[in-house]
Amino acid sequence: MIYNKNPIPTEGEILIATVKQIFDYGSYVTLDEYGNLQAFLPWSEISSRWVKNIRDVIKEGRKIVVKVIRVDKRKGTIDVSLKKVTEDEKRKKMSQWKKIQKVDKILEIVSQKINKTEKEGWEQVAWKLEDKYGDAYDALVKAVKEGDSILKNAGVPEVWIKPLMEEIGKHIEEKRVKKSEIVTLRSSDPAGIEKIRKVLGAAVEIAENADVDIKIYTIGAPRYRIDIIGTDPKLLSKVMTEILDNIREISKEEKVEFNVVRK
């Protein structure tokens, strides 16, 4: 189960809800991110267009994205809207929901291993990561790449550290992206092949220093394809620019003709 630091949501919050009961005047839903807290979805907030049957839009058991429109702390009631959620809000929420589910799954497994409750997992791990880094999932991704200091710096108790590090690698994979360029390198010098190797070797050194993977291969001389692979698209763009600038400079020194092939 997913737990939230706050006991109830705030107005305007976008949430995942599960439809529980449908009536002629609306539907009762549970809020998945608030320990299945109950909320009411009025008929008037289900669709912006006229519908004859409420079940044409929602069905029991289905998960929907809703916006909180009223919170009465005194009465303990919450009203939500389906129609006030934009397509962009829905898309972003569903993406976030997938991440929340991964965090929940990891905490469920690890808490069982160390004889803790899942709620303790949220309190001692997820909430601390949220306080320190803003997002628990992103912090776990960071821990995969940078190590357990990410967890320790957030104040996660030692008992969680090792089993968490063992488990997150099984559930969280960094999305790797690739940036490619095609260049031509020509030399009429008898030592031309060595000169071209020197030029391309400098490109490899730049990529390795930036901690990104690089592959260079011929696609039919004098054309060469340069692929760099990493997890940060902005960094890849910066590294590729540096590589091309460096190739241009060394090619000039070695009297190698260099061009970038426009794709």
From Swiss-Prot:
Swiss-Prot/TrEMBL keywords: Initiation factor, Protein biosynthesis, RNA-binding
UniProt protein name: Translation initiation factor 2 subunit alpha
Keyword Protein biosynthesis listed: yes
Cited NCBIfam families: PRK03987.1-1 (NF003062)
Cross-referenced Gene3D superfamilies: EIF_2_alpha (3.30.70.1130), Nucleic acid-binding proteins (2.40.50.140), Translation initiation factor 2, subunit 1, domain 2 (1.10.150.190)
SMART domains in alphabetical order: S1
Description of how the protein assembles with itself and partners: Heterotrimer composed of an alpha, a beta and a gamma chain.
A Pfam family this chain is assigned to: EIF_2_alpha
Organism per entry: Sulfurisphaera tokodaii (strain DSM 16993 / JCM 10545 / NBRC 100140 / 7)
Disulfide pairings: none
Protein biosynthesis as UniProt keyword: yes
InterPro entries: NA-bd_OB-fold, S1_domain, S1_IF2_alpha, TIF2_asu_arc, TIF2_asu_C, TIF2_asu_middle_sf, TIF_2_asu
